[in-house]
């Protein structure tokens, strides 16, 4: 069995949150907002734990805790005290008192602490035995027996109940009275219930009416019947209380469930927001990871390309060495063949001239031995070359295998990177799928909650339909009355709009109705004393009507006060608006001054900034031009150096055998220098492009400066026009003040219209000022400005004419506008001071305008565009002025409509007065007609009473309907505001997500564009390098052909130089001298080249700092420059070594001149062979270059394909991520919409339930009031019967003669008492309305004193008793017994309560 917890908390939402937590912990909860509600709940159902708030509205929680701990509602009742103002010290101090609580919590606290503390004080689960023991110890009442079946109605249907005063709610006094009444019959409740089930009571017998004992018996039977009805009412009351408690418990459980669902929804939203933030963070991390991977990929590709290039370079070097070894081997083979041929010739010559060369035989043998040694050496060298060749080939193959392995590793790494990227993309897709699944689950949960809510609504609707069906079955005759009530409500709804016009009529009607009712009451008390019961009912109704009219009078008084307050608020609003206009005018003038100062400061800053930019650009341009000149000089020097090197190569053909390796190295250096020259040319082109962009920026900056100066000139012109317009405005304002001084005195209703007209006029003047400020831009447009100013002046005159027309209707506004006029005078004085300050400022600006007019010629190009813009603005201003004029006309029409409405209201008031006069006349005629006959008077009184009650009911229902509609309007307004906030929040979220997606898309597009640009630059450079290599190959081919031709020419020359050895030796000496000079020139050129290379390196470093995209290439260029510097040093060493060798050879040349003729042929043959070798090398080199170009193209194609695939995959991943984010945003939006609808439906349901509970409380209060009235009647009748019985018991001791003598007076007295028992004792008559209590006591005092007086003198006792009464003793009154109609009324009342 669940423990019960009572939560006493004034804040409903906080109480629901605590109830949700405790219900989740296994407790059953109930709520109470005040201490009184908590006490009632403790009296009805004893809880196991009370969660008490110390700060309550009606009573302190500490006091209530002390009452609970004192045992007022049972012993051992646990209390958990909450406080937000006492603090820890206050709670600790209260803990030391005898009435300390069982637990304390300081607000704010965690809900988990509340659950834990509650679990520690009272465990959530106990057995049924403990519960039964607690119930037995605490005196818990058992459930009352089931409600008895309802009595059947009469055959003709239940009669109409008498009209009674409706009460809004039950009070504590009413509840105490009900408890006392039901407790008085509790001991005989079962017997009374059994008697109440009798369908029909026998009518009283006629013979019992003649004796006092019979009358007492009749009164006893009537009293017993009433007690039986009270027993049934008490049973029905208990059943209704239990139903109400169960309904409140169910509503509380539903509220707790709704609060729990709200907390779950808030938790889900929080978790969803956290998941969304985590998803966004993961997306950002993924984007950063992808960017890092792309950068790593690009860097890896770049490194791979560099490695491939270096490896190809090494391969080229190895191939060059192999080709060099092959050439050396072929040369040695040629020399060997040549030696063999010489050997054959020598043998033949030896056979022929054996005798001649016997002397030379030893020499020849030595020569043969030397040749054989040389042959052996050459053979050994050939073998070494072959071994070296084999080793080189094996190393090349091994190197190729290593390169293949590295390429394979790089490809595997690329595949692994792609796999990782695919895995990451799949992970993101999985996350997106999980997010979508989570959104689907959330949607399903929301649908389930909606379904549960719909089921609860359907169940509640079914219950409401059942209750309405029961009410419809029991209230058959009220259906027609309800239709009439609806029709009258519609009519009253239409009359609500006219209630302001009927205030005076209702007041007069109130006074006349009160006077008429009092007069009618006096006449009825004087004329129809025999109809005392009806008179009592009429008196009660008159009091009810009086109360209703007094309430109506109070309401009308409150409405008049509200109208007066609204009038005061309108006057205050008018004054505030005038002050706001003055402040706005001051703020506008201050804003104009501030804008002028800002324009001046902006101009100075802009001029300084532009001057600095121009100086920086000029210095940058000079530096760029200097670098360009240096680059050009470097290119010219390099070209001259290339030409010098080519001449040196052509001049050194005679020493080709010793300088062949140097030629190959020099060719390589020339190609590298050509590449550097091309790179320098590209850098020069880029520098020129940068220079062009800089010049364009300089031109744009100058244009901006010119436009700024033009804008400044226009602003100054506008300032002049503003000053002029200000003076005109001051004049216009002075005229307006003179005109308004004559228009004082106005009705309170039209003062607001005048203020609106003045505000419109001020706005029109402000728009005129703005238009004039805009149109006075230049002196060329001054004529157009004046024309528009005249048009505006005409419009202003029309406005003044319209204002003069309005002045006729505004003659009573002097008192209202006096204060406004004084404030306006102050503002005029301030404007005059401001005008003087502006005049001084204009004088200062006049000198500046003269200086700026010289600069106006530069802005003529922008003048036409500005003029068109000003013309457009002038058209818009004219249109706006027309709109303001139409608005003024609309206000005038509204004023006329208001006047017409006021006249119609006066007409309606007059018509209402006439109708009231007619009604009064008709009422007087009706009263005269009622005086003629008693029956006519009774009928008219019944009609008047019914009409008054209907009016009261209709007025009450109208008030309730009006309050309900106001509450609904407030609720709809709050719902609309909440919906607008939700929509604004969703729009903001959507805008944020859209901007985020656009930003990411722009970043990706920029990255893609950057990568495409880098790729295109790389391809362009690679194409350029390929073309350069082809060009160098062609140059080399041409150089080889030229050298071949030179070699052929040299062969011809060598044949002719055999006889000119001496002259050639001298020529060689001259050539050596020239070579020395060329060597010196080469050294100087190398030194200059080094300086140029250093300057080029510095320029390249600076360009590297400016162009981040060429950083890698510039680093390579620097490395090449360093290599070139090293090669230049090596070249200088080689040149020195060659010069030393040439000097040594020059010393030996004279010795070998004699052998030169013999070696000339050999050298020619060797030259031919070398030329052929060079041709073969060049062809092989061209072939290798083509292979390399093909390989580079293949690599570029593979790289482009890989980049395309990677970009496609990245784009697909980004599109999927974007689609997932779009779906997620849509899901969030749908969820928000569902939550908004769900909240709105919950609020509607709560409002309906609240209205239903209020209606039920109203019905219950009405029934309780009726029961209280009937019980009071019964109790008074019972008291009278007891007094009568006591009197008759005292009479039983007297003799028969005095009894007969006193029979007639006793009968009269009995009749009087019987009649008095039927009176309505709740509402006193008009004569005793001010003191109802004293009126009741004298009525009972004579009857109580009668027996005491009769004891000593029985015979004269009856006259003495009768002398105390107000009625004469000789009248005979007929006792009006309860009829069947009254019985049926009570039966119908009880049956209605049963249902």
From Swiss-Prot:
Matches recorded under Pfam families: Response_reg (PF00072)
Gene Ontology CC annotations of this record: chromatin; condensed chromosome; condensin complex; cytoplasm
Keywords: Coiled coil, Cytoplasm, Motor protein, Phosphoprotein
Biased composition (Low complexity): 1291-1306, 1326-1352
Residue spans of biased composition, Acidic residues class: 1382-1395
Residue stretches making up the Response regulatory domain: 4-122
GO molecular function, one term: chromatin binding
Chain positions with 4-aspartylphosphate modification: 48
Location of this chain's protein in the cell: Cytoplasm
Compositionally biased tracts (Basic and acidic residues): 919-928, 1228-1249
Coiled coil: 213-911
A biological process term (GO) from this entry: phosphorelay signal transduction system
Keyword Ribosomal protein assigned: no
Disordered, as annotated region: 137-172, 874-893, 919-947, 1212-1249, 1287-1312, 1326-1395
Disulfide pairings: none
Quaternary assembly: Interacts with MglA.
Listed PANTHER family: STRUCTURAL MAINTENANCE OF CHROMOSOMES PROTEIN 2
Functional description taken from the UniProt entry: Required for adventurous-gliding motility (A motility), in response to environmental signals sensed by the frz chemosensory system. Forms ordered clusters that span the cell length and that remain stationary relative to the surface across which the cells move, serving as anchor points (focal, transient adhesion sites) that allow the bacterium to move forward. Clusters disassemble at the lagging cell pole.
Entry protein name: Adventurous-gliding motility protein Z
Encoding gene (name): aglZ
């Amino acid at each position: 069995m669940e423990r019960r917890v009572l939560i006493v908390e004034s804040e409903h939402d906080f109480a629901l949150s605590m109830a949700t937590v405790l219900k989740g912990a296994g407790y059953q909860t109930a709520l109470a907002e005040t201490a009184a509600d908590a006490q009632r709940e403790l009296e009805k159902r004893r809880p196991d734990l009370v969660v008490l708030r110390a700060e309550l509205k009606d009573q302190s929680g500490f006091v209530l805790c002390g009452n609970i701990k004192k045992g007022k509602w049972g012993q051992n009742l646990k209390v958990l005290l909450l406080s937000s103002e006492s603090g820890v010290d206050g709670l600790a101090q209260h803990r030391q008192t005898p009435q300390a609580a069982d637990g304390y919590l300081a607000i704010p606290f965690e809900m988990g602490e509340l659950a834990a503390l509650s679990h520690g004080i009272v465990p959530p689960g106990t057995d049924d035995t403990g519960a039964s023991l607690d119930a037995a110890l605490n005196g818990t009442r058992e459930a009352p027996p089931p409600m008895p079946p309802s009595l059947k109605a009469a055959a003709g249907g239940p009669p109409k109940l008498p009209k009674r005063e409706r009460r809004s709610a039950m009070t504590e006094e009413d509840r105490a009275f009900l408890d006392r009444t039901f407790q008085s019959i509790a001991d005989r409740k079962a017997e009374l219930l059994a008697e109440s089930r009798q369908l029909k009571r026998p009518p009283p017998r006629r013979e019992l009416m003649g004796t006092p004992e019979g009358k007492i018996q009749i009164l006893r039977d009537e009293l017993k019947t009433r007690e039986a009805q009270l027993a049934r009412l008490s049973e029905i009351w208990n059943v209704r209380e239990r139903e109400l408690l169960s309904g409140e418990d169910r509503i509380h459980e539903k509220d707790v469930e709704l609060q729990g669902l709200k907390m779950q929804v808030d938790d889900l939203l929080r978790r969803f927001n956290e998941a969304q933030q985590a998803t966004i963070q993961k997306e950002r991390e993924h984007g950063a990871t992808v960017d890092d991977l792309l950068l790593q990929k690009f860097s890896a590709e770049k490194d791979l390309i560099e490695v491939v290039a270096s490896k190809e370079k090494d391969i080229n070097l190895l191939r060059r060495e192999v080709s060099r070894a092959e050439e050396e081997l072929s040369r040695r083979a040629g020399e060997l063949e040549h030696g063999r041929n010489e050997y054959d010739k020598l043998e033949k010559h030896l056979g022929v001239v054996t005798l001649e060369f016997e002397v030379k035989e030893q020499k020849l043998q030595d020569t043969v031995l030397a040749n054989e040694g040389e042959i052996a050496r050459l053979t050994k060298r050939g073998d070494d070359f072959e071994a070296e060749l084999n080793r080189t080939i094996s190393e090349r193959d091994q190197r190729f295998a290593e390169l293949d392995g590295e390429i394979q590793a790089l490809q595997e790494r690329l595949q692994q990177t792609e796999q990782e990227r695919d895995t990451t993309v799949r992970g993101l897709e999985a996350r997106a799928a999980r997010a979508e699944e989570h959104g689907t689950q959330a949607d399903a949960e929301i649908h389930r909650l909606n379904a549960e809510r719909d089921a609860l609504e359907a169940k509640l609707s079914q219950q409401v339909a059942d209750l309405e069906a029961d009410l419809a079955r029991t209230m058959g005759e009220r259906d027609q009355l309800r239709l009439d009530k609806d029709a009258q409500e519609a009519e009253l709804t239409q009359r609500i709009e006219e209630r302001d016009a009927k205030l005076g009529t209702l007041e007069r009607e109130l006074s006349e109705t009160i006077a008429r009712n009092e007069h009618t009451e006096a006449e009825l008390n004087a004329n129809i004393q025999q109809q005392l019961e009806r008179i009592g009912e009429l008196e009660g109704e008159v009091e009810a009507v009086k109360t209703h009219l007094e309430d109506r009078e109070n309401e009308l008084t409150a409405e008049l006060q509200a109208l007066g307050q609204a009038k005061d608020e309108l006057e205050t609003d008018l004054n505030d608006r005038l002050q706001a206009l003055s402040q706005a005018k001051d703020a506008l003038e201050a804003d104009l001054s501030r804008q002028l100062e800002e324009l001046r400061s902006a101009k100075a800053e802009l001029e300084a900034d532009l001057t600095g930019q121009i100086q920086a650009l000029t210095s940058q341009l000079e530096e760029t031009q200097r670098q360009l000149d240096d680059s050009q000089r470097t290119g010219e020097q390099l070209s001259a150096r290339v030409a010098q090197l080519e001449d040196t190569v052509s001049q050194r053909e005679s020493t080709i055998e010793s300088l062949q390796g140097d030629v190959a190295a020099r060719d390589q250096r020339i190609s590298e220098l050509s590449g550097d020259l091309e790179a320098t040319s590209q850098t020069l082109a880029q520098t020129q492009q940068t220079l062009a962009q800089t010049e364009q920026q300089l031109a744009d900056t100058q244009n901006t400066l010119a436009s700024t100066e033009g804008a400044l000139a226009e602003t100054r012109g506008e300032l002049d026009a503003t000053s002029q317009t200000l003076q005109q405005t001051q004049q216009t304002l002075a005229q307006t003040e003179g005109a308004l001084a004559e228009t004082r005195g106005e009705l309170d209703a039209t003062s607001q219209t005048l203020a609106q007209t003045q505000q419109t006029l001020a706005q029109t003047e402000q728009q005129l000022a703005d238009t004039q400020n805009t149109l006075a831009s230049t002196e060329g447009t001054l004529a157009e400005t004046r024309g528009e100013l005249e048009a505006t002046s005409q419009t202003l005159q029309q406005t003044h004419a319209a204002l003069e027309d309005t002045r006729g209707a505004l003659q009573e506004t002097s008192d209202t506008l006096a204060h406004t006029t004084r404030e306006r005078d102050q503002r005029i004085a301030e404007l005059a001071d401001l005008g003087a300050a502006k005049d001084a400022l204009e004088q200062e600006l006049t000198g500046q305008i003269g200086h700026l007019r010289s600069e106006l010629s530069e802005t003529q190009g922008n003048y036409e565009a500005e003029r068109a813009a000003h013309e457009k603005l002038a058209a818009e201003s004219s249109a706006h002025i027309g709109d303001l004029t139409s608005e003024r006309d609309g206000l005038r029409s509204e004023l006329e409509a208001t006047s017409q409405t006021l006249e119609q209201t006066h007409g309606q008031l007059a018509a209402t007065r006439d109708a009231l006069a007619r009604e009064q006349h008709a009422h007087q005629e009706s009263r005269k007609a009622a005086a003629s006959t008693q029956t006519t008077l009774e009928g008219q009184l019944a009609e008047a009473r019914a009409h008054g009650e209907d009016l009261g009911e209709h007025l009450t229902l109208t008030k309730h309907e009006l309050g309900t509609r106001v509450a609904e309007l407030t609720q709809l307004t709050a719902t609309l505001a909440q919906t607008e906030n939700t929509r604004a929040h969703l729009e903001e979220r959507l805008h944020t997500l859209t901007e985020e997606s656009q930003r990411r898309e722009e970043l990706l597009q920029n990255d893609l564009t950057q990568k495409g640009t880098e790729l295109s630059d790389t391809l362009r450079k690679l194409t350029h390098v390929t073309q350069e290599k082809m060009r160098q190959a062609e140059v080399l081919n041409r150089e080889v052909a030229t050298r071949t031709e030179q070699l052929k020419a040299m062969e011809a020359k060598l044949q002719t130089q055999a006889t000119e050895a001496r002259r050639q030796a001298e020529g060689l000496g001259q050539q050596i001298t020239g070579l020395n000079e060329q060597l010196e020139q080469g050294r100087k050129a190398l030194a200059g080249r080094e300086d140029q290379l250093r300057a080029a390196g510095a320029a390249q470093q600076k360009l590297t700092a400016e162009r981040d995209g060429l950083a890698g290439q510039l680093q390579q260029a620097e490395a090449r420059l360093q290599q070139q510097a090293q090669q230049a040093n090596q070249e200088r060493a080689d040149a020195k070594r060659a010069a030393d060798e040439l000097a040594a050879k020059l010393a030996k040349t004279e010795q070998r001149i004699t052998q030169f003729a013999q070696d000339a042929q050999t050298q020619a043959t060797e030259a031919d062979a070398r030329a052929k070798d060079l041709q073969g090398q060049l062809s092989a080199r061209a072939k290798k270059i083509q292979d390399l170009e093909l390989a580079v193209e293949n690599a570029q194609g593979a790289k482009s394909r890989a980049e395309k695939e990677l970009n496609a995959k990245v784009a697909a991943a980004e599109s999927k991520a974007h689609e997932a984010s779009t779906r997620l945003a849509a899901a969030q939006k749908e969820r928000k919409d569902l939550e908004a609808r769900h909240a709105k439906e919950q609020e509607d349901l709560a409002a309906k339930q609240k209205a239903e509970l209020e209606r039920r409380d109203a019905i219950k209060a009405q029934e309780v009031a009726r029961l209280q009235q009937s019980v009071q009647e019964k109790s008074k009748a019972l008291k009278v019967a007891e007094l009568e019985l006591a009197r008759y018991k005292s009479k039983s001791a007297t003799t028969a003669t005095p009894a007969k003598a006193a029979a007639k007076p006793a009968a009269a007295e009995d009749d009087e008492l019987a009649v008095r028992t039927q009176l309505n004792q709740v509402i006193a008559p008009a004569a005793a309305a001010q003191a109802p209590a004293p009126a009741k006591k004298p009525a009972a005092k004579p009857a109580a004193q009668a027996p005491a007086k009769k004891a000593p003198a029985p015979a004269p006792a009856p006259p003495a008793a009768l002398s105390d009464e107000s009625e004469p003793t000789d009248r005979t009154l007929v006792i009006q017994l309860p009829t069947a109609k009254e019985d049926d009324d009570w039966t119908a009342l009880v049956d209605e309560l049963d249902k």
